[in-house]
Amino acid sequence: PQTFEYVDLESVVGTEMLSHRTEVKSSAPSRAQRLAHTGDLFYQTVRPYQKNNYLFEKPDNNYVFSTGYAQMRPYADGYFLLSLVQSEHFVKVVLDNCTGTSYPAINANDLAEIEVTAPSDESEAQKIGTIFRSIDNLITLHQRQLEKLKNIKSALLEKMFV
């Protein structure tokens, strides 16, 4: 596309896209190469221990990711794959295959060679992905509730000791 939303390595934190910026093809960064499709998983290949990976679920395919991400197209449930690549075991295997110490990195070809255990039945992967998504949503809800309670406590303490 001539104009697109660019996602660089600072745009994704954890599994959330926090920002993106509009770019014009003629002046875009040279790393803006990976055209996103709904369902693609973008795996950060530099400092993978940060676990800044993103499952692209937007219906809009006008997003382009940096080449600092490996682009994966899941055979079944994308959330299953996201959960898998976020696991400590997977990160350890990736780090064992990285080059560099200050900024460990893995190239997309080496990443593609890493074997993972996944259900051969797509519906089973879908069910597992749905369970993981539900658990993550519940965790997020409880984290928000905890933050609200901390704010209430802080406000009460301020009023008590004024």
Identify the meaning behind each predicted range.
Residues 1-162:
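Feature detects amphipathic, helix-rich regulatory segments
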